Swiss-Prot record:
Superkingdom per UniProt: Bacteria
Pfam families for this protein: AcetDehyd-dimer
Family annotation (CDD domains): ALDH_C
Source species: Methylibium petroleiphilum (strain ATCC BAA-1232 / LMG 22953 / PM1)
Protein name: Acetaldehyde dehydrogenase 2
Keywords in alphabetical order: Aromatic hydrocarbons catabolism, NAD, Oxidoreductase
Keyword Oxidoreductase tagged: yes
Catalyzed reactions per annotation: acetaldehyde + NAD(+) + CoA = acetyl-CoA + NADH + H(+)
Entry annotation: catalytic residues: C132
Binding site for NAD(+): S13, G14, N15, I16, S163, I164, G165, P166, G167, T168, R169, A170, N171, N274
GO molecular function ontology, one term from the record: acetaldehyde dehydrogenase (acetylating) activity
Enzyme Commission numbers on file: 1.2.1.10
Any single GO BP term: catabolic process
The family this protein is said to belong to: Belongs to the acetaldehyde dehydrogenase family.
Length: 307
């Protein structure tokens, strides 16, 4: 007998939404059923249809009448920070759990190897995946801050222009605020700053991340190295292309780590590791919730609107 899977909807038919189809198709506990877009001619919707998903070009409102009939329990929002709160409200009201891949940060911020278990233990109906830069760098900042206090963390993510769609470009300010905030709230630094560089080079460059942490005291080098290497292994469990290029390098109280992220090449080529780390983290997060739902330990409940 086939294992029961939790049925999912994907909102947003751009780079991230389309890549997610492939990730969910491989999942043992998730099944992509619907793809929601706003442009009937979009490549993402066409590809979703070719892969056997139901589609609508009428936005979330086109999905709502089908949620109950098709048993949708988890939705992934890969649209924009501007429309996410409304999408979330409409679907939460029907008892659908939202995994938010926009920088809206309506719900708690989630980085799987750092705090996923904590979120699965609480009944949360919206979790936010921060940003691709956040998913790539916060594990490293946390790996340092769990050894000793970090006064300041600064990250620079260099992303291939071809991998950045119109949705991400429209959200660059939110991307910066949400990622900077998450370096503190999830990464454990006292202060944080995130910068994104969109690189137009041809052929496209692989995603690269530079992480700098300023510790309060002299860095405990051996412990930091062990902590960082073990964290990298944890991330590699769901993003195999997550790789240490150099570091940790110590210079006074500064700890620097240089990472690169290659994608699996599901939808965009492997240089778009920023897509992969985002979709893989979202998939890993949804799987954790799906396992709890299937085990009967998590009951999704419709969210009533505040009066």
């Amino acid at each position: 007998m086939a294992t029961k899977k939790i049925r999912c909807a994907l909102i947003g038919s751009g780079n991230i939404g389309t890549d997610l189809i492939y990730k969910l198709k491989r999942s043992a506990v998730l099944e992509p059923v619907w793809m929601v877009g706003i442009d009937a001619a979009s490549e993402g919707l066409q590809r979703a249809r070719d892969l056997g998903l139901k589609t609508t070009a009428e936005g979330v409102d086109g999905l709502l009448p089908h949620v109950k009939a098709d048993g949708i329990q988890i939705a992934f929002d890969a649209t924009s920070a501007y429309v996410h709160p409304e999408n979330s409200r409409k679907l939460n009201a029907l008892g659908v759990l939202m995994v938010d891949l926009t920088p809206a940060a309506v719900g708690p911020l989630c980085v799987p190897p750092v705090n996923l278990r904590e979120h699965a233990a609480k009944l949360e109906m919206n979790v936010n995946m921060i940003s691709c830069a956040g998913q790539a760098t916060i594990p490293i900042v946390y790996a340092v801050s769990r050894v000793q206090p970090v006064d300041y963390a600064e990250i620079v993510a260099s992303l291939a222009s071809k991998s950045i769609g119109p949705g991400t470009r429209a959200n660059l300010d939110e991307f910066t605020y949400t990622t900077s905030d998450a370096l503190v709230r999830v990464g454990g630094a006292r202060r944080g700053k995130a910068l994104a560089v969109i690189n137009p080079a041809e052929p496209p460059m692989i995603m690269r991340n530079t992480i700098n942490c300023l510790t309060d005291d002299e860095p405990q080098q051996a412990r930091i190295i062990d902590s960082v290497l073990s964290m990298i292994e944890e991330v590699q469990q769901y993003v195999p292309g997550y790789k240490l290029v150099n570091g940790p390098v110590f210079d006074g109280r500064r700890v620097s780590v240089f990472m690169q992220v290659a994608g699996l090449g599901d939808y965009l080529p492997t240089y778009a590791g920023n897509l992969d780390i985002m979709t893989a983290a979202a998939c890993r997060t949804a799987e954790m919730f799906a396992e709890e739902i299937l085990a009967g330990t998590l009951q999704l409940t419709p969210v009533k609107e505040a009066a």
